[in-house]
């Protein structure tokens, strides 16, 4: 999870740092609604994905909506069609902000209460971590990525957590998003090959409108 300064400098130069959404783009999206197909999803995730398409906030790029409350994510084609859905493992601690400077710290120094998956809108791109793995970098500055599930510590039971029917046991990581390896290879990697994309991580503590200030649910004239 710890990031080399050279990687951070490159990421900042490419504009890959995460941030809070402040305004939608001016161009119209191809679809007025996101198409979840037969995938079950919360009303909040559906409404948010619909807003992405109606506002064109994804700028014609592939996008992911991560529902932290339900510990699941949805990968969409640029036109709003669902490419795939999966359970996900998230940061051990509840919370919507990363601790300042956490990307510079060694894993051993990160306390349990600091292991959060931040909420927000992030421009994401495929790349390599500090080893040899390919990952989807979500926030370089805070060393948050989406990657294949880590199975090097059997005691953490990460595969079992992903397979369980409840999101209650999906909190185990230092903040990164873990998905099944097959899902990463078949859905995430092809979606982001040759292109950047947007990752939206919905908050679990802060109000949705406090993170995405331009968001308006369908049929509403007020910020949620």
Predicted features and spans:
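N-terminal secretory signal peptides that target proteins for export/translocation
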Residues: 1-5
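Bacterial N-terminal signal peptides
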Residues: 9-22
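Sec/Tat signal peptide C-region and signal peptidase I cleavage site
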Residues: 22-30
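N-terminal, Lys/Arg-enriched amphipathic/low-complexity engagement segments
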Residues: 29-43
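Soluble non-cytosolic domains of exported or imported proteins
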Residues: 39-43, 60-63, 67, 174-178, ...
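Gly/Pro-biased beta-strand-loop elements
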Residues: 44-157
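Exported/periplasmic cell-wall-interacting domains
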Residues: 114-224
């Amino acid at each position: 999870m710890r990031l080399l300064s050279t990687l951070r400098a490159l990421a900042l130069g490419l504009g890959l740092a995460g941030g809070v959404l402040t305004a939608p783009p001016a161009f119209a999206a191809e679809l007025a609604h996101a198409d979840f197909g037969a995938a079950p999803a919360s009303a909040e995730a559906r409404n948010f994905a619909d807003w992405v398409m109606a506002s064109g906030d994804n700028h014609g790029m592939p996008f992911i909506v991560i529902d932290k409350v339900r510990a699941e994510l949805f990968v969409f084609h640029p036109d709003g069609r669902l490419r795939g859905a999966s359970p996900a493992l998230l940061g051990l601690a509840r919370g919507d902000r990363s601790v300042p400077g956490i990307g510079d710290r060694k894993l051993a120094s990160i306390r349990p209460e600091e292991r959060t998956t931040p909420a927000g809108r992030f421009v994401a791109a495929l790349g390599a971590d500090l080893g040899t793995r390919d990952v989807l970098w979500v926030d370089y500055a805070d060393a948050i990525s989406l990657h294949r599930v880590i199975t090097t510590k059997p005691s953490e039971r990460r595969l079992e957590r992903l397979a369980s029917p409840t999101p209650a046991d999906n909190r185990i990581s230092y903040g990164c998003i873990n998905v099944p390896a097959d899902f990463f290879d078949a859905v995430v990697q092809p979606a982001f090959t040759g292109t950047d994309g947007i990752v939206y991580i919905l908050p679990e503590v802060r109000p949705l409108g406090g993170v995405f200030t331009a968001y308006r649910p369908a049929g509403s004239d007020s910020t949620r």
